[in-house]
From Swiss-Prot:
Its EC number is 2.5.1.6. InterPro entries: AdoMet_synthase_2_family (IPR027790), AdoMet_synthase_3 (IPR042544), S-AdoMet_synthetase_arc (IPR002795). This is S-adenosylmethionine synthase. Pathway: Amino-acid biosynthesis; S-adenosyl-L-methionine biosynthesis; S-adenosyl-L-methionine from L-methionine: step 1/1. Transmembrane segments: none annotated. The keyword Nucleotide-binding applies. It comes from the Archaea. Its cofactor is Mg(2+). ATP binds at G141, Q142, G143, S144, V145, D146. One of its GO terms (molecular function) is magnesium ion binding. Keywords: ATP-binding, Magnesium, Nucleotide-binding, One-carbon metabolism, Transferase. Gene3D superfamilies: 3.30.300.10, S-adenosylmethionine synthetase, C-terminal domain.
Length: 404
């Protein structure tokens, strides 16, 4: 039986506080590149394991490192000089031993991992030449498992927590959070790239709300081959600015908006790139240094420092409970009695993941409602998701869950 505690959140609703800061690192930021690769490798390994053995074996691929390359960008088109270096590390089960026959089944861990990383880079960075601009090196530590253990796992219904750890989540997103998230999604959308191809993928959106005014400061890489002159570079920024302001109108909810793009630019130095990412110019990246599981960095909300991307989706609490916390928070926030919700879930190592040590639900009731009106419904939401926690794992394995 899960230990679920529902209490009133004794704080001002986030949208009514005087100041809020929210950040999102776009998919081409070096840290986000590492997050994306780590998760893509994990998903690919999950699919390979299921195809070969019908069950996901132990792995953690959350140790991806990116070492920045060296490029010579110039208006009209520059070139890469030294490639970006990507190191895949972590651990994965690479062989299964059948003790009865003495046979060992080898599993293509390295091939699967490298292919997944390269496919992700191809998808995420439109202007990168995979043959020349990036080196992918696989140093994933390889382990083995007994075939009997594999079949035991198939029969085992509920995985046990790999660690004593916690996950956190909140809902609904504040006005500032929505605008920051949707702004980066817009700038990295296929629709916008078709109109303004000069917009690179390395985008960081920093949102500041002061009262009813939201200020967005955006760092946005521009791809050099789409800007033959400084005037064309500025035109890329102007078109992006216009689209950001237009898109934000859907989420402003009465707030004033001010948008700045590439405020460090001057005549001697602009954010010009060959590939669309600062990783080409010495900016390094690591898994877990950027967005949390909900895609945002939110210093005015509770956050976990745990990297979600690349961890195994079967029993790694740092992954499952962070994703689950956000799902439960979203469902609780949908209740008419709830204005705002925060979730914290704590595991205990070795215990079933359906039985957390505590699942804390904190709510701000809507006007006219009390905590008593909320408690039973919120508890039922949490119990439903705990009972169906393996549905969360399935969504992760299928690549249907965002981890950064």
């Amino acid at each position: 039986m899960a230990n679920i505690v529902v209490k009133k959140l004794e704080r001002t609703p986030i949208d009514e506080t005087p100041v809020e800061i929210v950040e999102r690192k776009g998919i081409g930021h070096p840290d986000s590149i590492c997050d994306g690769i780590a998760e893509s490798v994990s998903v690919a390994l999950c699919k390979m394991y299921k195809e070969k053995l019908g069950v996901v074996l132990h792995h953690n691929t959350d140790q991806v490192e990116l070492v920045g390359g060296y490029a010579y960008p110039k208006l009209g088109g520059g070139c890469m000089i030294n490639p970006i270096y990507v190191l895949l590390s972590g651990r994965a089960t690479a062989e299964v031993l059948d003790k009865e026959t003495g046979k060992i089944v080898k599993l293509p861990v390295n091939t699967t991992a490298v292919n997944a990383a390269r496919e992700y880079l191809k998808k995420a960075l439109r202007n990168i030449d995979l043959e020349k601009d990036v080196v992918v090196d696989c140093r994933i530590g390889q382990g083995s498992v007994d075939l009997v253990e594999v079949f035991d796992r198939k029969r085992s219904e509920i995985p046990h927590a790999n660690d004593t750890s916690f996950g956190v989540g909140h809902a609904p997103l504040s006005t500032t959070e929505k605008i920051v998230l949707e702004t980066e999604k817009l700038l990295n959308s296929a629709e916008l790239k078709a109109i303004v191809p000069g917009v690179g993928e390395d985008i960081k959106v920093m949102g500041l709300r002061e009262g009813k005014k939201i200020t967005l400061t955006i760092a946005m890489a521009v791809v050099d081959k789409y800007a033959d002159s400084l005037e064309e570079y500025e035109k890329v920024k102007e078109m992006a600015h216009k689209k950001v302001v237009e898109n934000a109108q859907k989420y402003l909810n009465g707030h004033e908006l001010e948008v700045f793009i590439n405020t460090a630019d001057d005549e001697e130095c602009i954010f010009l790139t060959v590939t669309g990412t600062s990783a080409e110019m010495g900016d390094d990246g690591s898994v877990g240094r950027g967005n949390r599981a909900n895609g945002l960095i939110t210093p005015f909300r509770p956050m976990s420092m745990e990297a979600t991307s690349g961890k195994n989706p079967i029993n790694h609490i740092g992954k499952i409970y962070n994703i689950l916390s956000n799902i439960i928070a979203s469902d609780v926030a949908e209740l008419e009695e709830v204005k705002e919700c925060q979730i914290r879930i704590l595991s205990q190592i070795g215990k079933p993941i359906t039985e957390p040590k505590i699942l804390s639900i904190e709510v701000i009731p809507e006007n006219g409602f009390t905590l008593d009106d909320v408690t039973k419904k919120a508890t039922e939401v949490a119990e439903k998701w705990l009972d169906n926690i393996q549905n969360v794992t399935e969504k992760i394995v299928e690549g249907k869950v965002t981890t950064f």
